[in-house]
């Protein structure tokens, strides 16, 4: 299925249930709720938050479903606002290629990120590397 086909399917599916009448601003609230669920799962996967009794496979499956739920809300906001996501995503690819045309600059950009991050922590008296 192509991106445009998915968006058209979603709009028709919503229309059959009259969910196409929900305001984009309210759909955004639902998207933020889904984003929170994605955030919680990533925190568990990365070890920042405890995940009692959940296997890595279950976490990955749950994350896939929550990402799908978030995608639904984003595609819904797009169709409610008259935006074709396939076109928008192609434009986004062109924007990224124009902004970062040379893939070899990735390591330098990443190194700069870490330098800024460590400086931020040092300015606040926080440790860059937690004690072992």
Q: Which positions does each model-derived feature cover?
A:
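Flexible "arm" and connector segments at domain edges
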Residues: 1-67, 71-132
């Amino acid at each position: 299925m192509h991106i445009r086909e998915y968006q058209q399917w979603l709009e028709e599916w919503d229309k059959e249930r009259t969910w196409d009448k929900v305001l984009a601003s309210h759909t955004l609230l639902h998207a933020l709720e889904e984003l929170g669920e994605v955030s919680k799962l990533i925190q568990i996967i990365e070890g920042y938050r405890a995940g009692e009794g959940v296997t890595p496979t279950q976490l990955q499956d749950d994350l896939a479903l929550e990402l799908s739920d978030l995608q639904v809300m984003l595609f819904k906001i797009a169709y409610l606002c008259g935006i074709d996501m396939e076109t928008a995503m192609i434009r986004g690819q062109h924007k990224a290629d124009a902004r970062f045309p040379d893939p070899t600059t990735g390591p330098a950009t990443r190194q700069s990120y870490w330098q800024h991050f460590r400086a931020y922590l040092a300015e606040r008296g926080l440790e860059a590397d937690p004690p072992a």
